[in-house]
Every structure is written in structure tokens, then in C-alpha cells.
Regions:
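Short helix- or helix-capping micro-motifs
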Residues: 17-22, 138-143, 150, 170, ...
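Short hydrophobic alpha-helices at membrane interfaces in multi-pass membrane enzymes
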Residues: 136, 174-194, 231, 340-341
Length: 502
């Protein structure tokens, strides 16, 4: 008991952050949204776990993404879900609405849990570097930012990549600080980097970025003797980090044990064949295109982040650059954050496949600059104390809550008030993922004799598992003798689709 009390005393701030992050994401977690890719990821999780437990390790090379981290999380979630189902309900049909939502909850819950674990460790580092007040502002900024909130509640890889990349750089920076070199934090950075690379190929940026990080940390005065010592430190520490990272990648992806060449070939195809060449359909500024161009991500930053984050992060970047030239004072972590944002956006802009969620890994770094600006501003007015910071954090939370509570749990519908919210944003770049399905399936299920209705929807539709009746694809209309009782169409595209099918 004494050990627990001491542990809580030492880490109570991190413990509170951990639970706030998780609890805020729990309401309707298994009932709100089946994201567009969720059925595919559920299938991939099944393939991965089946291959893993049958000893068919080559079969764990399921997709080019490669999504290995998500499939590990999903595999564990399925086991826990099955255990609880047996204890609470006995045998349950996972294709039934209740069975599906139960499993869906556990799959997403363990994603949220993983995010919270790595974010909490990162907050520990921030607290050691900048103090409690800075960390509190950062936590509130990031945790309740609508775009990050939305993607941290779905069965997908982007929030994982975001948190793991940021955590990896924080752990490595903290572990390599002069007088504080800690191999434990370097190894933890390697683990986070490996899990990020195993999630999505855009995480490969972590390799050159970590080298750059070490250069920023170790390079000091520019004389021959110190340069030689610094470069030795960089080479030794980078090789250590690099080898540990590759070891984690190898250990956590069984396909590499038995068919490394094919596995790496498939991974590379995901970069060159899909990411660079394939593109993705958009209605960008009212024009249909597969590549919205170089301005896509800067405009996405403006229309998808909250005004508070946009203004404060922009001011923070300006303040940082001003400080560098005016006072020759450089915060190395902020310098690295600026490098990351610039190189990541440059890398992603060079590919033809562009999506709003691909900007997600930059959010923690923008939040860092926003927090920096607020902390400097409060210091200037001599109000950098707990009551004032708590008040500012409360304002940020209240602002974000007011922006999203009307659309709960459809956080994906958030667009900045700079452009008039969703009504303005959808004409610039409409969200690629649907929302509002919960309201729709609740309405359909509430209709009289819902179980006997013949329902037609254009597939793929993502609320089918929650329906109490049988639904058909509209292409099957001519094949059924019974006429449809209800047709659910997504929009103008579906009317055009039906006209083509007569």
C-alpha cells in the first residue's frame, strides 16, 4: 500500500492525464461510427491472428500499410472481448447488433488505451522539460482538439502513427540530453518508432529525423576537437537506436522471420505503388481530382484545426523564429518540431495520394508551439501561475467542447469557424469518411415493424451491423421479387448511381 501511495504521489499528474484522455473517449465508443476502413481492418485482424496462432507467420503480412501494430492491438482486443462475452453472456453471435457493438467497443478501447499509454509517457517527459503548467496546457490543447479526438476514436492507424512518432522523438530527445543520457529512454524511443513504422509507411521519416535530432542535441561549439567528439556520439548513439528499432520491427512482425524479402517488397509497394502514384479522389474546391496539389495540407491546417490552435501555433512559430534571430536563443525541441512539420508536410505533399487525416502527425508539434506561445505570453504579463494556467486550460477545453458537443459523437464533421463550419468546409474538401450513421440506424430501427422491412442501401454501408432488419444493395433491386420498403441514399452521387442502373 505504501508503494502505491508513493507511486501515486510521484506520478499523480500523469495518472490523471491518462484517465481523462481515456474517459473522454468512452461515450458511445462501440456504437457511434464504423469508419470506412474498419470492416477491412477487422478482416485483417482476423487474418493476422489466424496466421499468428496457426504458425503461418508469412500470413501475418496482410497488407502493404502494413498496420501490424493495429492488428496486434485488435488481436488482443478480440481475445479480451471473447473472454468477457463468455463470462457475462455466454455464447454471443458477433454478427448480431449487440455482439458486434461489444466487439467493436473493445477493439477501439484498446486503441484508445495504447494512445493514452504513450501520450502519458510523453507528458512525463514534457513535465520534466518544461514543468507542470506547460504540460497542462499542452495536454488540454491536444486531447480535446476535434480532429485528433475524432481519429483517436476509430479503428485505424493515423492516431497511432501521430502519438507514436511524437512519443519516439520526445523519448529520444530526453534520453540523450547531456548529463541525462538514459538508454532506457532510448530503447523506449526505439519501441515507439518501431510500432509507428509497423503502422504506416509515412513513419519511415522517423529514421532521418532521429539522426537530425541527435545532431541538434550533440553538436556544440564548432571547433575541431568538439566536432570529432560530437560526431562520435552521434554515430554511436544512432547506431544503437537504429539497431534496437530494427530489432523491435523484426520481433513484432512474424512475416519477417520467414519471408523477409516478400514482406519488405509489399511494404515498399505501399509507398511507391499506392502512396506516390495512385492518388485519391477529392472534390477539392468543387473540382474532381485525384491530387489536390501542394496547397492541400496548408489549407487543411487552416480549415480542420480549431482557430485557437491555428492562431496560437502560428504565433508560437513566429515567436520562436523571432527569438532565434533577436536573442540567439534556441529551444532545441522547438527547433526539431519545426524541422519535423516542414519535412513531413513536404514529404506528404510530394505524393499524389493526399487525405486530411494525413496531416494528423503534425498536430502534437503545432500544439507544442501553441503551448509555447501561451506560456511566454503569460510570463510577459507575469501571470504564469497555476490559477491562471488552469483558467486558460479551462477556456481551451470549453471552447473545444462548445465546438463539438452539438455534433457528438460525429467529431469528423468539425470544420473551423474561420470558414463557417461544416457548411463552408464541405465545399473546400468534404470529409472522406461518413458520419451520422448512428442517427440513421436508430431511426430505421425505430420504424414500425422494422424487423420485417425490406431495406435497400448502396453498398458499402457501414451501419448494417446495427440494423434489426435485412438490408440489400440497391444493385440487387432487379433480382428480388419483393419491392423495397425503404431506400437509403447517401446523396447526389447515389441518385446518379441509380439513374445509371435505371
Amino acid at each position: 500500500m505504501t508503494k502505491l501511495k508513493n507511486f501515486y504521489k510521484l506520478y499523480k499528474v500523469e495518472i490523471i492525464f491518462f484517465f481523462v484522455f481515456v474517459i473522454y473517449r468512452l461515450p458511445l465508443l462501440g456504437l457511434d461510427i464504423i469508419n470506412t476502413d474498419a470492416p477491412r481492418w477487422k478482416s485483417r485482424i482476423y487474418e493476422f491472428s489466424s496466421a499468428l496462432f496457426s504458425g503461418n507467420f508469412a500470413g501475418t503480412n496482410v497488407t502493404y500499410h502494413p498496420g501490424v501494430t493495429l492488428m496486434w492491438i485488435g488481436t488482443f482486443a478480440v481475445k479480451v472481448s471473447n473472454l468477457f462475452q463468455k463470462i457475462l453472456y455466454g455464447a454471443v453471435d458477433v454478427t448480431s447488433p449487440s455482439g458486434y457493438s461489444f466487439l467493436h467497443f473493445w477493439e477501439k478501447f484498446f486503441v484508445v488505451l495504447t494512445l493514452s499509454i504513450f501520450l502519458t509517457l510523453g507528458l512525463y517527459v514534457l513535465r520534466r522539460l518544461y514543468g507542470n503548467l506547460f504540460t497542462l496546457i499542452f495536454f488540454v490543447f491536444l486531447t480535446f482538439e476535434p480532429l485528433f479526438l475524432a481519429f483517436s476514436r476509430v479503428l485505424h492507424t493515423d492516431a497511432l502513427v501521430t502519438t507514436l512518432l511524437f512519443s519516439s522523438s520526445l523519448f529520444l530527445y530526453y534520453g540523450l540530453l547531456p548529463k541525462k543520457i538514459s538508454k532506457r529512454w532510448v530503447v523506449l524511443s526505439s519501441l515507439a518508432a518501431a510500432l509507428a513504422v509497423l503502422s504506416k509507411s509515412n513513419s519511415l521519416l522517423v529514421f532521418p529525423f532521429s539522426g537530425l535530432l541527435m545532431m541538434v542535441v550533440f553538436l556544440g561549439k564548432f571547433n575541431k576537437k568538439t566536432l570529432i567528439i560530437s560526431f562520435k556520439k552521434i554515430i554511436v548513439n544512432y547506431l544503437f537506436w537504429f539497431v534496437i528499432t530494427l530489432s523491435f520491427i523484426f520481433l513484432l512482425w512474424p512475416a519477417l522471420w520467414v519471408s523477409p524479402v516478400q514482406t519488405i517488397t509489399d511494404y515498399w509497394y505501399g509507398i511507391t505503388g499506392v502512396g506516390i502514384e495512385e492518388g485519391h479522389f477529392h472534390k477539392w474546391m468543387g473540382i474532381e481530382t485525384n491530387d489536390p496539389g501542394l496547397l492541400f495540407y496548408p489549407i487543411t491546417y487552416f480549415i480542420r484545426f480549431t482557430p485557437t490552435l491555428v492562431i496560437s501555433s502560428f504565433c508560437g512559430i513566429f515567436l520562436f523564429i523571432y527569438g532565434v534571430f533577436k536573442y540567439r536563443k534556441v529551444d532545441k525541441l522547438l527547433l526539431l518540431s519545426l524541422f519535423f512539420v516542414f519535412t513531413y508536410l513536404l514529404m506528404m505533399s510530394s505524393t499524389s495520394k493526399k487525405l486530411d487525416r494525413y496531416i494528423l502527425p503534425t498536430i502534437p508539434y503545432f500544439v507544442l508551439f501553441g503551448t509555447y506561445y501561451i506560456s511566454v505570453f503569460l510570463r510577459v504579463i507575469k501571470k504564469y501561475n497555476l490559477p491562471t494556467v488552469f483558467f486558460v486550460a479551462s477556456l481551451i477545453f470549453t471552447s473545444n467542447f462548445m465546438l463539438t458537443y452539438k455534433t457528438f459523437p460525429n467529431y469528423l464533421s468539425y470544420y473551423s469557424s474561420f470558414i463557417g463550419g461544416y457548411e463552408g468546409g464541405k465545399f473546400i474538401d468534404k470529409s472522406q469518411w461518413p458520419f451520422g450513421h448512428r442517427e440513421l440506424y436508430l431511426y430505421i430501427n425505430s420504424l414500425p415493424n422494422a424487423e420485417t422491412l425490406t431495406l435497400f442501401i448502396r453498398r458499402p454501408f457501414l451501419y448494417d451491423p446495427y440494423l434489426h432488419n435485412i438490408a440489400y444493395d440497391v444493385v440487387e433491386v432487379k433480382n428480388l421479387a419483393k419491392p423495397g420498403d425503404l431506400f437509403i441514399l447517401k446523396g447526389n452521387d447515389d441518385w446518379e448511381f441509380l439513374n445509371e442502373k435505371s
